[in-house]
A protein has these predicted regions:
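Glycine-rich, aromatic-flanked loop segments that form ligand/cofactor-binding clefts
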Residues: 46, 71-101, 169-175
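Low-complexity, flexible helical/coil segments
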Residues: 57-61, 80-88, 123-129, 159-164
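Helix-rich catalytic cores of soluble enzyme domains
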Residues: 94-198
Length: 198
C-alpha cells in the first residue's frame, strides 16, 4: 500500500493540485477537531508531534511515542475514522532536544527517539540533525557530520519499522523528510512580513 503523502506527490506530478494541513499539536481538543474534519471530508489527517512534546522520557506531555499514537488511535476509533486515514508524524526528530549534551549522549537519545516513533507506527518522520550539540566545534556544522548523524537516525527508524512490521504485516512504511529547509523548530527567530512556501 502506498503512503497517502506519496499518492499526493504522484497527483502533483500529474498536475493535480492537492494537499492536506499538518496539525502539530498534542492538545486533545485540537486533535479531535482535526480527526472530525478528516472524517467529514474523507481525507487523511496529518498530526505531528515534536521531540519536546513526545519522547522516550515522556516529553512535556508525559507521553512516549506509543502513548501518543494510542491516544490518537483511540480518539479516531471513537469518531469512526479508520487508522489508515491517520498519518502520525515526528517533527524535527534528532539531537535538538539534547543540544546541551555531548554528541555521544545526544545521539544515543536521538537514536532511541526515532526508533520509538517508527516502532509506534508514526509514518512521516522528519529527521533533523542540523542542530549542534555541546561538543561540536565553533562555526557551521559540517555537512559530513549532519549526514552521518542523519544516516544513523534513518537506520534506527527503519529498525523500529521492521519490528513493527513483523508484528503488524500491513504496517505502512514511513516516509522521511530530511534536513531543516523548513522553519526552525518553534518558528522564526526574527520578525517576518512575508510568507514563504516550504
Amino acid at each position: 500500500m502506498k503512503h497517502p503523502l506519496q499518492e499526493m506527490m504522484d497527483k502533483r506530478r500529474e498536475g493535480i493540485r492537492c494537499g492536506i494541513p499538518s496539525y502539530c499539536s498534542a492538545n486533545e481538543l485540537v486533535i479531535e477537531i482535526a480527526l472530525r474534519r478528516a472524517k467529514e471530508r474523507n481525507i487523511p489527517v496529518l498530526i505531528e508531534a515534536t521531540a519536546n512534546q513526545v519522547n522516550q522520557f515522556g516529553g512535556y506531555t508525559g507521553m512516549k511515542p506509543a502513548d501518543f499514537y494510542q491516544m490518537v488511535l483511540k480518539m479516531a476509533s471513537a469518531i469512526g475514522l479508520p487508522e489508515n486515514m491517520m498519518i502520525l508524524a515526528g517533527d524535527h526528530l534528532g539531537p535538538l532536544t539534547w543540544q546541551k549534551l555531548p554528541e555521544s549522549e545526544a545521539m544515543e537519545n536521538s537514536v532511541e527517539l526515532v526508533y520509538q516513533y517508527a516502532r509506534a507506527g508514526f509514518t512521516k518522520i522528519h529527521l533533523d540533525t542540523s542542530m549542534k550539540v555541546a561538543d561540536d566545534p565553533e562555526g557551521l556544522l559540517q555537512t559530513e557530520v549532519i549526514a552521518r548523524r542523519g544516516a544513523k537516525l534513518y537506520k534506527a527508524a527503519m529498525k523500529g519499522y521492521e519490528e513493527l512490521k513483523a508484528e503488524k504485516p500491513d504496517a505502512m512504511r514511513p516516509v522521511f523528510v530530511i534536513g531543516s529547509e523548513v522553519p526552525i523548530p518553534g518558528g522564526a527567530t526574527e520578525a517576518e512580513d512575508t510568507l514563504a512556501v516550504t
